[in-house]
Swiss-Prot record:
<feature type="zinc finger region" description="NR C4-type">
    <location>
        <begin position="54"/>
        <end position="78"/>
    </location>
</feature>
<dbReference type="InterPro" id="IPR050274">
    <property type="entry name" value="Nuclear_hormone_rcpt_NR2"/>
</dbReference>
<comment type="function">
    <text>Probable transcription factor that acts in a feed-forward loop with nhr-68 to activate genes involved in the vitamin B12-independent breakdown of the short-chain fatty acid propionate. This pathway is triggered in response to a diet low in vitamin B12, when canonical vitamin B12-dependent propionate breakdown cannot function; the resulting accumulation of propionate is probably sensed by nhr-10 and/or nhr-68.</text>
</comment>
<dbReference type="GO" id="GO:0030154">
    <property type="term" value="P:cell differentiation"/>
</dbReference>
<feature type="domain" description="NR LBD">
    <location>
        <begin position="152"/>
        <end position="392"/>
    </location>
</feature>
<dbReference type="Pfam" id="PF00104">
    <property type="entry name" value="Hormone_recep"/>
</dbReference>
<keyword id="KW-0675">Receptor</keyword>
<dbReference type="GO" id="GO:0008270">
    <property type="term" value="F:zinc ion binding"/>
</dbReference>
<keyword id="KW-0805">Transcription regulation</keyword>
<comment type="similarity">
    <text>Belongs to the nuclear hormone receptor family.</text>
</comment>
<dbReference type="GO" id="GO:0000785">
    <property type="term" value="C:chromatin"/>
</dbReference>
<keyword id="KW-0238">DNA-binding</keyword>
<feature type="zinc finger region" description="NR C4-type">
    <location>
        <begin position="18"/>
        <end position="38"/>
    </location>
</feature>
<dbReference type="GO" id="GO:0004879">
    <property type="term" value="F:nuclear receptor activity"/>
</dbReference>
<dbReference type="GO" id="GO:0006357">
    <property type="term" value="P:regulation of transcription by RNA polymerase II"/>
</dbReference>
<dbReference type="InterPro" id="IPR013088">
    <property type="entry name" value="Znf_NHR/GATA"/>
</dbReference>
<feature type="DNA-binding region" description="Nuclear receptor">
    <location>
        <begin position="15"/>
        <end position="90"/>
    </location>
</feature>
Length: 395
């Protein structure tokens, strides 16, 4: 430690964090250290005698990046950490900003007088908002590359270390052209070759998309592989659902007209049949109901991808991923406030982020199904797919 004086003494004191969401605490509110956002949320809930319900058995995560997602779980967390409802009185502790009583390192304020309201626009906010716009435009490029004829034959290592194709304007102008194969002229029931074809294409695009994310590019190679492996099952599912033409809530259509619905497929492993029912019921229906736009989809996809808790991600990369994810989450919420207004934005924001719980559950179940299918040779995975799903074997 360098230097002396007051700053030395201050730096030796551990920062107190909000026991509810782990943001920086602004002091003790209702008996526990908490931030202004959680203090305000708890007070409003008690004063208005509000009750909430949870769509996911009360098991939603509550942290500073997604604390607005599920109000039921957030309120339960307030009670669990010891917030005292009896400490709230009508004329005491009015809702508003509480001056910090200790000097903390400068942080970006993400809460204002209302729960999860966007802070005043700062340079940081503008940077985050600009990146959200970039994510949306990149998503359009992903769609173009997905529908093109171009499909390289390469190993996973070659795919990850090569230059990003989506940012190569010359390449995109020459190759990102709609393939005649990907024009829907009629519908036909998908077979195993169709599933294989579209998963391989979506994995190819996923890697090129990941390379447009500065956070991903800053990671060591092993952490990049861990993130790609973590999303190898869920990324195609999201893309299939979002880009499917509307043929009802029981049908998902690939760009070439192949489709699947609730029709049982006895030739496919049991776990894969379960996955398609999950996609229809837990992804397609809510996403169609919300009418998610390109920007919201692009942000949600990135938030789920940049998971600091993904298997095999090194501890040194977790903060980088968490910060990158939080920046996108902040920008997404501000975007929703502008689009829907503050009153509806919180509910929409929460409903979208809670789809991450669906994806996480799907990933765990499908990982086991994939291992079983490979062990019993129920599905013939390509070399590239095996490298992505099971890891790169070293001699």
């Amino acid at each position: 430690m360098t230097g002396g004086g007051p700053s030395s003494n201050n730096s030796s004191q551990p920062e107190e964090v909000c026991l509810v969401c782990s943001d920086i605490s602004t002091g003790y509110h209702y008996g526990v250290p908490s931030c202004n956002g959680c203090k305000t949320f708890f007070r409003r809930t008690i004063m208005k005698n509000q009750t909430f319900s949870c769509q996911f058995q009360g098991k939603c995560p509550v942290d500073k990046s997604i604390r607005c997602a599920c109000r039921h779980c957030r309120f339960e967390k307030c009670l669990q950490v010891g917030m005292d409802r009896n400490a709230i009185q009508q004329n005491r502790d009015p809702i508003g900003y509480t001056k910090r009583t200790r000097r903390y390192p400068p942080i970006k304020k993400v809460e204002a007088s209302d729960e999860c309201s966007p802070a005043m626009v700062s340079e940081n906010d503008r940077s985050e908002d600009n990146f959200l716009t970039l994510l949306s435009s990149t998503e359009q490029k992903c769609c173009a590359l997905r529908l093109a004829e171009y499909m390289p034959s390469r190993t996973l290592i070659e795919a990850v270390v090569s230059d990003c194709l989506l940012t190569d304007e010359v390449f995109m102008a020459e190759h990102a052209i709609l393939s005649p194969r990907h024009r829907v002229t009629s519908l036909r029931f998908a077979n195993q070759s169709d599933y294989h074809y579209w998963h391989e294409r979506d994995w190819f695009v996923m890697i090129e998309w990941a390379k447009t994310l500065p956070v991903f590019q800053s990671l060591p190679f092993t952490d990049k592989l861990a993130l790609l492996r973590h999303s190898a099952i869920t990324y195609p599912s999201l893309v299939h659902v979002f880009n499917s033409p509307d043929h009802g809530l029981d049908t998902i259509v690939f760009p070439d007209g192949a489709y699947f619905d609730r029709t049982p497929e006895p030739t496919r492993p049991l776990g894969f049949n379960k996955k398609k029912y999950q996609m229809l019921d837990q992804l397609l229906k809510p996403m169609r109901s919300m009418e998610i736009d390109m920007t919201e989809f692009a942000a949600f996809k990135a938030i789920f991808f940049l998971n600091p808790d993904a298997d095999d991600v090194d501890s040194n990369a977790k903060k980088t991923l968490s910060d990158g994810r939080s920046a996108i989450t902040n920008a997404l919420y501000r975007y929703m406030v502008k689009k829907k207004g503050a009153e509806d934005a919180g509910d929409r924001f929460g409903r979208l982020l809670l789809l991450g719980t669906v994806l996480a559950t799907m990933a765990v179940e499908m990982k086991e199904a994939v291992l079983v299918a490979d062990f019993f040779d129920q599905i013939q995975f390509s070399t590239f797919a095996k490298q992505l799903l099971f890891g790169i074997k070293t001699e």
